[in-house]
Amino acid sequence: MIRILVINPNSTVQMTESVKSVLDDCTPPNVQLEYLTCPPEGPKAIECVSDGVRSAAVLMKYFEDHPPQVDAFLVSCYSDHPLVTTLRETYRKPCTGIMQASILTALSLGRKVSVVTTTKRYEPLLTDGIHAMGISDSVFAGIASTGLAPLELDSKPRAEVDALLARTALRAVNEMGADVICLGCAGMTHMAHVLEKAVGPNIPIIDGTKAGVELLASLVRMNLFTSKQGVYQAVGSD
């Protein structure tokens, strides 16, 4: 049995439960998912670089006190979250974030990838994170923001949120030229159907949480691990 730890790096339990409700219905065979929400001293949402740094520090302290007994890590935050790099430096076990998993999956399915996300502040942050993966603008159509804060995805009226998601997805396709769309927030995990209805049956909608689970399960099955030669070598080993 492959054990994957799905980490919500914010302290909002409702977001963890939302991701769990989707993943529990599509877990691959012989895979066991375990879930961890950031302890209460962490941020309630990841809305800026500082939030990411804070949550990574809180979670790494948690792992010092509670060594993880799993085969892989999925960081369920759509950002270039520092916890991904920190876990890769600390463990040999495969680790990915949902941003990385969704982009790699999307590039297997189309030629122009766009991300529908939350606040406008995330547009440059996600653009920088995706470029840091080595993804060029020849295949990256850009970031389309709804203007909603992550927690507003569930706190605002459902019809209002759905309408914003639909309009933003259509903008990504019609104005930005996207032929694949990634859900740019873990809080959108249960909203893929809204975008699918808006853009029609020819545009794949990628949920990074699902893509991340499938990617990590494949890496573990192939007995692959995080490279320890280079940037992810153990601290102090060079």
Swiss-Prot record:
It comes from the Eukaryota. One of its GO terms (molecular function) is amino-acid racemase activity. It holds the Pfam family Asp_Glu_race. Coiled coil: none annotated. InterPro entries: Asp/Glu/hydantoin_racemase, Asp/Glu_race, Hydantoin_racemase-like, Iso_Racemase_Enz_sf. GO terms for cellular component: cytosol; nucleus. Belongs to the HyuE racemase family. This is Uncharacterized protein C1F7.10.
